[in-house]
Amino acid sequence: MVRAGGWAPQDEVLGETGCGTLRRQMKQHLAVSAIGNDRTGMVHDLTRVISDCGGSISESRMATLGNEFAMLVLVSGNWHSLAKLESELARLGESTGLTLHMKRTEPRAPRTELLPYSIDVVCLDQAGIVAGLSGFCASRGIDIAEVSTRCYPAAHTGAQMFAVQMIINVPKRLQLAHLREEFMDYCDAQNLDAILEPVKS
């Protein structure tokens, strides 16, 4: 039976359940952090669970930190896949001792008002290097997208060195020539060898 206006009773049912079905089929995202004692097979354990649940790794960062191994992973999948993954990862944490945190999220929208730049810094190891660089960026409204650091002995002297790599997003409102000059002045004052250049696409 069709009611006035061409509306049928089943349309209401299809509308309600259809929206729910559509939401479950749409790609969703889960951010996962995991840390545990470094051992062979950790990456396989985590990625196998993601794959078995129907998830797909969109982005990831993994590193050894002391005797620990840390992983940051952005997983995409439909509602059912991610709901299953949340349960399976909780089981994995209990069985392996991994400390896991999970949070539903959305991919970041394109930010056309920002220009990606890379920072490379090398210096003698000393306290406060990252704090100083991040403070320089924060005071100018510059977003830090990625940070990577490491310590290593200098090849000839054996002196302990410190290296920093950053990806920053510079607002287009800033004058790049002036920013570069300020940055180099800051690094000279701190005895940092530094490079600031656009990210090559």
Which ranges hold each PLM region?
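A conserved regulatory-domain signal marking ACT and ACT-like small-molecule sensing domains
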Residues: 22-201
